[in-house]
Swiss-Prot record:
The name this protein goes by in its record: Solute carrier family 12 protein B0303.11
Cytoplasmic side: 1-23, 75-95, 160-165, 234-244, 306-345, 389-394, 441-927
Keyword terms: Cell membrane, Glycoprotein, Membrane, Transmembrane, Transmembrane helix
UniProt keyword Transcription regulation present: no
Glycosylation site residues: 275
Membrane topology according to the record: Multi-pass membrane protein
Gene Ontology CC: plasma membrane
Major location category of this protein: membrane
Subcellular location: Cell membrane
Protein family per UniProt: Belongs to the SLC12A transporter family.
Organism this protein belongs to: Caenorhabditis elegans
Amino acid sequence: MPSSTASSEDAPITSTAWMNWKDVFLKCVQPMLAVVLLLRFSSIVDEAGFTTTIILVFFTFLVSLVTGWSACTVVSRKSSEVGFVKTMLAYSSTEFAISFSIIYLFCLLVATSTFLTSAAEAVLHIFSTFSLELLDGATHDLRLVSSVLSLITLALCMVRNRNARFVRTFIFALTCIAIALQLSSVMFRYGEYQLRRVSDRNAMIPSPPNEEISTIFAQLFPAAMCGLTILNIGSKLQNTAPRGALIAIAVSACFYGAAAMLDYVEFFARTSTSNSTGSAEYNEFLSYIYTTVPMAIVITLACVLSAVSTLKYAAVILQSLGRSNQCRCILWLAKGFGERDIPIRCLLLLSTVQILVSAIGSYDILCIPTTVFYLFAYALFNFYVFLVKLSDPEIPSPPTLLSLAISAACFIASLYTNRHLALFIASIFAISYCSLLYIIRRERNEDGEECPKSMYSSVLEQMHELQQEPDSRRHFHPQILLLSGSPAARPGLVDFAHSITRGKSLLICGYIIPKISNKVEQPMTWTEYLMQQSPCSRSYLLQLKIDKQINDWLRAREVNAFGAAICCTKQAEGANILLQTAGLGRLRPNILMLGYKTGWEKLSKESISEYYGMLSNAFDKQVGVIIFRNEASGFDVTSSIRKNGAPINDDEDLAEYVDSATPKLADQGSQKKDVPRGKLLNTFRKMSMAVNKDLESGGRRSTSSSTRFQVIDKHSISEPDQKIIMAQMFRFRKRIPNARIDVFWLREAGGLTMLAPYLLTQAGSFLEGAHIRVFTKTDGKDNKRINEEQKNMAAILRKFHIDSSDLHILPEFSKPPCKQTYDEFRAKIDKYKVETSSSGEPVDGSFDNNQIFNLREKTRSFLRASELIREHSSDADLIVCTLPSARPEIPSPIYLGWIDMLSRQTPPTCLVRGNQVSMSALRLKFP
C-alpha cells in the first residue's frame, strides 16, 4: 500500500496515478476512528471521568499532530524517495535511519496484532449475542478468530484489488455513519461492550486493572498511531498530500472531543446489556441484535482494513532493510515476486509473528505494548527533528522547543505506561544504533583513505588522457563561462545556461568582484572598506568566502556548474582574465555568456564601453558569445525580494556586496531606481528541496529537470510581489509543453547559432522536445540562388536532425526598415553622438556622423531583421538570432543599439555568435 513494492491497493509500478490529500486522509483517519472510538471510548470516559479524558485526548492528538507535522516536512523535502526506509535514509544518518526503521517495524507489527485482536473481539461479540462458543468462549476463541483473520489479511495483502480505493471509501463511510448514529443516540452505544469483554481465562497475561490511569491512557493512545503514516506512502504524492495527514489528525481529535462531551452530558441512551440472555423480552432482544451486530460488523471491517495497511507497511520496510547494505543477514527477505515486487517472504514471516503476538491476549493487553512502542518511536523521531532544526533553522518543521518538549513527554509517558517494556525498546534501539555506528565507522576507516585517493588519481589521469587526445578524435563541446555576478541574484540566467549544458559540458559561473566607491559621507561597513582598497590579502579572503558560497548555492540548487570569483577593479579586465585562466587543460570555456544590459541608453559612456569591452575581448579571443535577454521580467530578482525596503537576510554587509550591485551584466527590467542594494544571498543559499514537482497535463510527472525545484520561506518575500518573484526564479526550470524555438540565421558565423537551440530541445531542458523553425535571408533574387541557399541550409539542418520543411527563406530582408523603427534606434543612440572632429576618432562610448554613415548598411540590415523577428516570432517561446560581430571600429553605442533593436518587444531572445569556425570544420557529436 505505501510503496511501489507490495502494493495491492495502488496502481502498478508503471502507473502515473498520484495520491492527493483525500487519499492520504483516508489512509490515516481510518485506523484512528474505528478501533478506539467504537470499541473502548465510552468505557474510557466512564472510568477516567470527563476532565481526565479531555486531557488524555488533548495530549494524544497533540503528540500525533506535532509528529505528523514533522513527518510532512520530511516528505516535502525528500518526496522523490520511495518508502519509509529510503525517506529516512535521505533525511537522516544511516545508523539512525536503520535503527529507527527497526523500531517502527516493531510498532507496525504490534499494531497489526492489535487491529486483528480488536476485530476478533467484535466477531466474538456477535457470537456471544447468539450464545455461540467455538472453544471456551474466552481467550481460545479469541486466538482462533484472530488467526483466521490473520490469514484473511495475508491473502488480501497478496491479492491485488483494483477497486481498493472505493472499498476503503465505502468502509470509511460506514464507519462515519456508525459514529454519527452513535453520537446522535439513534442506536444503542456499542461502547457498552465493556460488559462483553473477553474473559481472561486461558490468557497468557491477565488484563491490568482498569482504574489505573496508565491503563486508560494505553487504551486510548492507539488512536494516534498514524503520525508517521505519510512516511510510508513514498513518492506518489501530489503537492497537497501532506495536508491530508494533518486534516486526518484534526478530524479525529474533533470526533474524540465531541464524543467525550456528549458522553459527559449524557446525550446517549444507556441500555444495560448484561441481562440480555434469556429473561429479556423477544422484541428487546431483536432490537439489541439490530443495533449492536451491525456496529460489530463495521468495526470488524475497519479493523481488518487497517491491519492490511499496517502489514503492508511492515513488509515493505522489512524488504527495504534486507536490501540495504547494513542488514546483509536478512538479504533473503529482500526478494520480491511478480511485476509489483510483492515481498511474499516478508509477509509470511510477519504474519507468523503477528499470529503469535495476537495469542497473548485481548485488546486490553496488546494496547500497552502498542502504546509504548509508538511513544518511544515518536520520542526518537521528534528528538531527531529537534537536532536537525538546530543545525538548520530554515527548515519549516515545528519549533525547536516544541519538538524537544514532545519528545521528552513521549519518553516519560512510555516509562509511566510500562517502564520495563520501554527500557527493553530502548535497549533494542541502542544495540542496533551502536552496532551500525561501529560497522559504518570501521568501513570508513578501512576505505576512507583509499577512496578519495583513487578518485583523485583516476580523475587526474583522465584529465591527462583528455589533454593528450589527438585532434582527429576531438569533438566540439559547448563549454560556457557565464558572467552571472552572484548566481543567487540571477537564478533564471543560471538555469538557462544549465539548460544548454545539462551537466554534460562545462559551465562556470564567473563573478568579478569590483572596487566600489563610497560617495556618500557615512560610516563604511567592513566589506565596503575592503572594496575601497586594491586587491590584497583581505579581499582575497573575502573572495574565497564568496567563491565557497557560490558553489554551495549551485550545489543546493542542483546546477552542475563551478563558481569562479576573482577580484578586479574593471569588469572588462576581469572577464578577460577569466577567459584566459578559467578551466584546466581541455576543460576551458569556449563560449562567453552574459545577460543583456538593460537601460544602457541611460548609462554613462564609461559603463557601456566597459560592457562592450567584454564582448570585443571575447571576439578577439575567438570564442563564442551568447547574450540572453528576458525582456518580460528580467533576471535580477534581488531588487524585488524585500521587506519594507530593507534586506531580509542577516548578513547585510555581505549581501550588499554579493548581490546585484556587482556586476550589472544581467537584465534588470524589474529594478527600481530608489531601491537599496542589499539582497538575498542567505535566503537563496539556504533553499531546500521541496515537494514542488510540477505535474504535466493528465497527472504526468515532469521531466528529470523538475527534480531541481526549490522553495523559499513564504515569509521572506513581500506578498504582492511573491508570484512575480517566483515566476522569475523558476521561469527557465518549468518544462514548456509544445514549445517552439525560432532561429534567425542571419549569416554563418559558426555552428553555435544552430547548436544552442538544438541542445535546448534535449532532455533536461525547459524546452525539451520543442519544435524548431529556422528563418534565413537570401542575397539573390533569382530562384536558382534561392534554391542553392536552401540546399546549403538543409544540409546544416540535417546535422541537427531538424526537418528541412521547417526552413523558411525570407526575401523581405532586402526591404528597408520603416521610419518608426529607424527613429527608435536613433532615439537610443543620439545621447552618445558627438560632432565630427578633424582631430581624431571620438572617445570611447561615443560616435560621430562619419561612423554612423559608414555603418548604414549594417544598421539597415539589423533594423529590418528586428521588424521581421517581431512579425514572425512574437508568439515563440524562445528566439535565437545571430549576434552582430563586435569589431574595434564599431562604436559601442551603435552596437548596443543593434542588439537592443534585435531583442526588444519579443519573447526571451538569445543572441548567438560562434567562434568564426564554419559548420563543416566543427566536429559535432550528436546522440
